[in-house]
Amino acid sequence: TQKWTLFPYTTLFRSGTKNYVSTDDLRMAVNASVTLERPLIIKGEPGTGKTLLAIEVAKSLKMDLIEWHIKSTTKASQGLYEYDAVTRLRDSQLGDERVKDIKNYIKKGKLWEAFESDKQVVLLVDEIDKADIEFPNDLLQELDRMEFYCYETGETIKAKKRPIIIITSNNEKELPDAFLRR
């Protein structure tokens, strides 16, 4: 496992770097999350640097950052994929050849993108508390197993490399206990 080199335990940058000011507790939490390969939940008021933390972690580990910004209308399944049945129906009526391959109508979500990456990435799930209360619980299995099933194609999508997952919350509403325990 690799250490988060931006804020290692022994460094002159005890309070962060030129781009990010950090506490010892935050450095320890990030390093524990990276080492244990568990998602890190960062809570705080808007504008306190939660999103910037994910950017700095990705930079320090020299990894790509995949950002999934959550809105009040976002569904957990959108992080996996979306199937566009309406366009497929229209294309079938027009005799389009694309209709023969259902994959042409699957829009990959940010989790799918992170899972299929050939190299490890940092996945930011930004402002998870904006979604409905069931949103976090709907992702539990996928985040635990690092895989999900695509019913339309009949394939199981497994993470090639386990992403480093950073989840932010503005404390607008409480996250479910089951989600926090994992």
Segments predicted by a language model, with ranges:
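Short, small-residue-biased leader/transition segments that mark boundaries at the very start
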Residues: 1-12
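Dynamic helix-loop-helix/coil hinge segments at AAA+ ATPase domain boundaries and subdomain interfaces
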Residues: 10-26
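Walker A/P-loop
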Residues: 40-86
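A short helix-turn-beta junction within AAA+ P-loop NTPase domains corresponding to the substrate/partner-engaging
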Residues: 63-65, 177-182
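AAA+/SF3 P-loop NTPase mechanochemical coupling elements
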Residues: 105-106, 112-120, 150-169
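Conserved AAA+/SF3 P-loop NTPase catalytic/coupling segment centered on the Walker-B
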Residues: 109-110, 115-143, 174, 180-181
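Conserved Walker
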Residues: 128, 145-161, 173-178
